[in-house]
A protein has these predicted regions:
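Ligand-binding clefts of soluble mixed alpha/beta catalytic domains
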Residues: 4-137
């Protein structure tokens, strides 16, 4: 898939999530970085509930890459140390919850219970959107 096809597909997916009026529940279980995370039903795109497992990593980029960019002239030991600090301060599910990107950090064994609860809570969700003839994508 060439880059223009990928960009079109990402735009269509973003458009679909942004205009969906159904309950939107998201569970982050692993790595969720950059614009790919934003496109995949993030809180900023309109997700109603976002849960994260304790092992999730949420942020702009992976900690190792961020440390290599910020400390390009440092030795490997310093880069590893700074990557650990970055991961804790910027990419952890706790920091994502503090910023409002995640509603609750849940244990993997409780995922089913939380997702069912979210859909039960959102069962009566109604979104009033203005009438329009068509979208832009």
């Amino acid at each position: 898939m060439c880059s223009s096809d990928l960009a079109k597909a990402a735009a269509k997916l973003t458009y679909a999530f942004a205009n969906a009026t159904v309950p939107k529940v998201n569970v982050v279980i692993g790595k969720a970085f950059g614009s790919a995370y934003v496109t995949m039903n993030s809180k900023s795109l309109g997700a109603d509930m976002v849960y994260a497992w304790p092992t999730a990593e949420i942020g702009m980029m992976e900690a190792d890459l961020a440390a290599k960019i910020m400390y390009a002239d440092a030795d490997a030991e310093t880069i590893n140390e700074k990557a650990k600090e970055y991961a804790e301060l910027q990419s952890s599910p706790v920091s994502a919850a503090r910023r409002g990107y995640v509603d609750t950090i849940i244990q993997p064994a409780d995922t089913r219970k939380y997702v069912i609860g979210a859909f039960e809570m959102l069962f009566t969700k109604r979104e009033e959107s203005p009438m329009k003839k068509h979208g832009t994508v």
